[in-house]
Swiss-Prot record:
Heterodimer of an alpha and a beta subunit. The beta subunit determines specificity for ATP. GO terms for biological process: succinyl-CoA metabolic process; tricarboxylic acid cycle. It is an enzyme of class 6 (ligase). Belongs to the succinate/malate CoA ligase beta subunit family. ATP-specific subunit beta subfamily. Mg(2+) binds at residues 240, 254. Its cofactor is Mg(2+). The keyword Mitochondrion applies. It is found in: Mitochondrion. This is Succinate--CoA ligase [ADP-forming] subunit beta, mitochondrial. The record marks 76, 144 as: Important for substrate specificity. Its main location: mitochondrion. ATP-specific succinyl-CoA synthetase functions in the citric acid cycle (TCA), coupling the hydrolysis of succinyl-CoA to the synthesis of ATP and thus represents the only step of substrate-level phosphorylation in the TCA. The beta subunit provides nucleotide specificity of the enzyme and binds the substrate succinate, while the binding sites for coenzyme A and phosphate are found in the alpha subunit. The lineage of its organism: Eukaryota, Amoebozoa, Evosea, Eumycetozoa, Dictyostelia. Pathway: Carbohydrate metabolism; tricarboxylic acid cycle; succinate from succinyl-CoA (ligase route): step 1/1.
Length: 445
């Protein structure tokens, strides 16, 4: 598995949601983990722990949504598109509908909006231009809120455990609050050996501005959220907003939950909720072969062993003016089959114009890498130019295997050389495609 640090760094480059709570470098960062559940799933789980959430139900058709609204028997309704991405409220559907969260006053309204959401693609600032297809909508009761606040529990590497993070400015982009008004962010580190303490939750409840009569209720909800976080091996429990309603209730209006994939064996029921249709299919495919893959936006594919070397390879590609198309770590002991599948995966990305293979053989043997590359090239007739830099165990055997293969592999002896060749080739291929030209490369470059 990727380390949290590597995942955080890579996913930040994908413009995924991350939170830095200090002006300077902070260790308080959360990121998308292996499992991220839908809002309706999150609220169902939370309710079983006594956490207050709005009444609601999920629908997969406009007719189901209408029936749910009829049963709720109220004119104060909300229909929410269910996608694993933030920014729904300001998103745009391929149907032309603006906003993935719509207020409704009747069951007919709910059906109308559900029909414009279900089966359509929602594009938000977090989905990228491809967006995500909506397969469910969540129909809930609407509440009139007296005050909206932000509350989260996440893992803090610096503190060595969980920390509660809260702000009186909820219902908005919390990253913007942290950037523009860091004094509005409050933190309470938790000693995992004794758990969250009443004085901690009271301090936060008072700083958030709960009315005096609701301080104890807010404390109770914070304690239950912490219990949920610990018992389910969460990496993030985010409530935005945590609200005080006009009727005097304390409600978790919207929830984002992430679970530690390393604890999947302890929570099979939770991990069955994984919605692969909302994930990058390349990442799903990579997981089948125990490959650590994260798709990016560039045009230079990367196949590397070791997360640190992979990060360095991506950095040097950027240094020479290129842009990596992915992070792919085959690990320290990959098989020929894994290498073959890694090459297939990278080459399946139409944006990729060149591929950099950078292997330092320790436990991983260079000849295994060479055999995997050749197998993939022969099986798929891959035309994408490959720049291969190998060093370490069995490197001479690997070079001979590649020379004897008769395939047009571009060799490099050091990382600078490999990166420069990869960037140059990607530029040439991109220009040729724009000009509708066919090109070939004469070796050595």
């Amino acid at each position: 598995m990727l380390s949290n640090i590597v995942k955080k760094t890579i996913q930040s480059s994908k413009n995924l949601k991350s939170l830095v709570l200090n002006k300077s470098t902070s260790s308080l960062v959360y990121q998308k983990r292996f499992l991220n559940v839908h809002e309706y799933q999150a609220q169902k789980m939370m309710k079983s722990y006594g956490i207050n959430c709005p009444v609601g139900n999920v629908a997969e058709t406009p007719e189901e949504a209408e029936k749910i609204a009829e049963v709720m028997n109220t004119q104060d309704l909300v229909v929410k598109a269910q996608v694993l991405a933030g920014g729904r409220g300001k998103g745009i559907f391929t149907s032309g509908l603006k906003g993935g969260v719509q207020l409704c006053s009747s069951a007919e309204d709910v059906k109308k909006f559900a029909s414009k959401m279900l089966g359509h693609t929602l594009v938000t600032k977090q989905t990228g231009e491809d967006g995500k297809v909506v397969h469910q909508v969540y129909v809930t009761e609407r509440h009139f809120l007296r005050k909206e606040m932000y509350f989260a529990i996440l893992m803090d590497r610096k503190a060595g455990g969980p920390v509660m993070v809260a702000s009186p400015e909820g219902g908005v982009d919390i990253e913007g609050v942290a950037r523009d008004n860091p004094s509005a962010i409050f933190k309470e580190p938790i000693d995992i050996m004794i758990g969250v303490q009443p004085e901690q939750t009271k301090r936060l409840a008072e700083k958030l501005g709960f009315s005096k009569k609701n301080i104890s209720m807010a404390q109770d909800q914070m304690k239950k959220l912490y219990d949920f976080f610990i018992k389910n091996d969460c990496t993030l429990v985010e409530i935005n907003p945590l609200a005080e309603t006009a009727s005097g209730d304390v409600l978790c209006m919207d929830a984002k939950l992430n679970f530690d994939d390393n604890a999947a064996f302890r929570h099979p029921d939770i991990f069955k909720l994984r919605d692969k249709s909302q994930e990058d299919p390349r990442e799903v495919k990579a997981a089948e072969f125990d490959l650590n893959y994260i798709g990016l936006d560039g045009n230079i594919g990367c196949l590397v062993n070791g997360a640190g070397l992979a990060m360095a390879s991506m950095d040097i590609i950027k240094l020479y003016g290129g842009s990596p198309a992915n992070f792919l770590d085959v690990g320290g002991g990959a098989t020929q089959k894994q290498v073959t599948e890694a090459i297939k995966l990278i080459s399946s990305d139409k944006k990729v114009k060149s591929i950099l293979v950078n292997i330092f053989g320790g436990i991983m043997k260079c000849d295994v890498i060479a055999l995997g590359i050749i197998a993939a090239l022969k099986e798929l007739s891959i035309a994408t130019p490959l720049v291969v830099r190998l060093q370490g165990t069995n490197v001479e055997a690997a070079k001979k295997i590649m020379e004897d293969s008769g395939l047009r592999l571009i060799a490099a002896d050091n990382l600078d050389d490999a990166a420069q060749k990869s960037v140059r080739i990607a530029e040439i291929v991109s220009l040729a495609e724009k000009s509708d030209l066919e090109i070939s490369f004469k070796l050595p470059l």
